[in-house]
Amino acid sequence: MEEYKYVGKRLPRYDGMQHVLAKTRYINDIRLPGMLYVKAWRSPVPSARILKVDVSKAESLPGVVKVITWKDVPYNRYGFVADYPVLAEDEVRYIGQEVVAVAAEDLDTAMEAVSLIDVELEEREPLLDPLKGMEPDSIQVSPEGNFVYFGDKPVRQIRKGDTDAAFAQADYIIENYFRTAAQEHCPIETQCGIAQTDVMGRTHVYSMSQAIWFNKMWLAPILKKPQSMVHIMGGVVGGGFGSKNDPHTDLICSVLSLYTENRPVKWLWTREEEFTSSTHRGSMHMFFKDGVMKDGRIIARQVRSIRDGGGYILTNDYVGAKHAYGVAGPYNIPNVKVDTYVILTNKRPVSSMRGFGLYQASFADEVQIEKIAKTIGMDSWKIRFINAVRDGDTSSTQAELHSCALIEVMQAAAQRAGIKLDDDLLTMSSKVRLEV
């Protein structure tokens, strides 16, 4: 057997020794001369018009260096479709949305300054249910409506084959509803960022970001500077899982640094802020309908999914599209119809988290397999083997598949788990499809 250098070997983590010796340097460990500290006034309600913002008392507090509102942000929009304000302007869309930011000599002063800010809100009825958000007379979260668009359509559609004809042919029609809950990433290290603008006007950012180039792409227009004048230095990420793809602290710190006469500003979120204001995995509703033959073949699948998109778009369209691609699972289903919607609500924004929509699809898909097995009286392992993709099959998007290995992986998993498979399953291969 060929000896490999890495494959099959237990290798030490390159950063393991630094971690166990407590020598790893995180963004919060950075101390710079003249450091200022940031806190923000956040919305206490999920939906409201902003009638008045008075920061005069906060500005006059000794130790406060700068207080900013949206009027101080050179360009107050970011995101892939630039719908998200750095600081809220005339409305708030979720509890915890930043309206005013303060930079002060110390954290206590920054917190006191926030308590002196007077914001008058006209509270509105919030939209909290994405299913209700699809109704014609629903509360509108955005002036453009509640539907997140995929190109020029408010739905991501996938069509393969003729599902209506296949359902008419099927021996069983099996329908189920699945719902996955919202989920917080809970990184051990909460959001943290440091920014400093030097005498040449170049803004330097110490970032824990998982997506530094996204930050750079968004920061340059926000600051109205070329990208060459935005310098982002990545650090060790103390747990991210997708939450640190979004620039929770970097944008506001960078804007504040424009006004602090070259002094660095730092913002470390509390655990409460992490829970209430960071992006998270949104909940999803999934309606599955499968057409199944007595021999276990799934010949048709129809899925309607609705994702709770939170207050702004961010990566919602991408996550919705990936979810749509994934609802057929690793199975060869000849007829597929998928409609995936993302609906804005008055909740904190949702964004990337491990799997980008595929986790929800896989959960529903595999539970559906178990329910099919129970309905038709067949072992669920056998159903998975019968329907597993083979080389030459096509995906739900009609891409031809190669290098398939699901059958071999299931055979190995069963062996390791001590599960005895029938002989006909052990002779199956991902390279050739045998008659059932």
Task: List the predicted regions and their residue ranges.
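Structural alpha/beta core scaffold segments of enzyme domains
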Residues: 1-436
